[in-house]
Amino acid sequence: MIKINQIKLPVTHSDEALKKKIIKMLKLNAKTGFTYRILKKSLDARKKPELFYTYSVAVELDDTKNSEAAIVKRANCSSVLIYKEKEYRIPAHGNISLDRRPVIAGAGPAGLFCAYILAEAGFRPIVIERGSRVEKRTCDVQKFWESGILNPKSNVQFGEGGAGTFSDGKLNTSVKDPSGRNRLVLETFVRFGADPSILYDNKPHIGTDVLSEVIVNMRKFLVDKGVTFVFDTCVNNLDIVSQKLLSVYTDSDSNSNSEIKTDVCVLALGHSARDTFDMLYNKGFDMECKSFAVGFRVEHPQRMIDESQYGIQKKIILPPSPYKVTSNFPNGRGVYSFCMCPGGYVVNSSSTENHTVVNGMSYHDRNSKNANSAIIVSVSPKDFGADDALAGVRYQEKLETENYKRGNGLIPQQLFGDFCDDRLTTAYGDFSSCTKGNTVFAKLNGLMNADMEQSFKLGMEHFGHLIHGFDRKDAILSGMETRTSSPLRIKRDESFESNISGVYPCGEGAGYAGGITSAAIDGIKVAEAIIKKYRPDFK
């Protein structure tokens, strides 16, 4: 195949215009037959209001007699080159016999993709998920948003699909992976029902509504491959002798302290499994604090963001615009946007009684009237006194319990202008909030320390110079966003094992990922490490 980069066309272009551009760049005869596939598509707004789409495409000629090398040479363009797609391959089995099925704790993206690769290699893992399957989980979450009645075992954080199931469903990642794992993740989502556009969009997005369907289809496939799923069941203990795993113990409403004998356990816990973190710490796992960030969800009218980013009022051909903003200050604080949701909702994503935490969520169509993003301030171990590996967890809990008190269990909100003036908000400004979960006006001042709060205000002011209106007085703040990433890391060696033989920390909760795709990739890497070491010899 031939790859062409940097094909630039107006956003209003037709499919025929793209085809003509390919013919021109390859200097082909108009009668030469070929097919093409879009590899990457991104919006170029650097000359707004003139907007362009930039493409990379893979071209295959109908007539194999035409030499691709000769065509590339004739094109005489650095954007035209020979292309060979990287095909992902599962590694060969190792030599150590594994006669007991591996256990995966957690059915988020890390756990699901670890199970997917292990199943394809014949390992038939047992997946233990503390929350419910996605069909029941969706009902539990909706009930919580409508009534405020929380199910601590099945909520926005816990359940099949992980926390990302109730998010924007962004699939972009900064992970550079030459082995084809990133492509495999996207292709797998498409295989189970996602829009094929995620394979080439520069900022792929699946949406919480579509992602739920994809997860169900993926689970059904894995069950057919011999994977066992156990829902509403928590891994509550590990039997460890001489630094080696012997058994996993689980707890559920119907069966407490049930034993599963195994030599391999993947800890794909997610970032909110605080009781499990406690258990692992007390069991002697090597763990450490790590930096993370906290802040508030900030809402603006989506139309305002579109006009700033596109330079024109958005037309029907353009999707709701995302944004990404960052700043750094002399005090060492970074302030930046996180999990930006165009056309999205602020959601109550609490998972613990008497704690309130928020996140952002979008459906596939991104059709709400507001844009929202977490605007967060960096937190380092020095902010919470890192006397042990769980200090960051305790800091999160402190913020969430105080946040709960401010809103009396509802999402506390304050307009940015009132936040700056340390004043209680009494009414929305020119636009109202788009939320899933009930809200109340409350003061958010003092939740963060003075240095962090000042950094947040300065960050908002700076972002107002980048996006007109970002620091408008009626921007809506919702408190608090505390679970941007895991506050700890469970250490592992080059073979992905912890200091306990047979236990593999994995994904976001273990401190090795940040988002759906990077967590899925880490799950694949851990599965590969297990496959390279063992061969399945169980019945």
Residue ranges and their predicted role:
Residues M1-Y53, V57-F166, K170-K539:
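Residues forming the flavin
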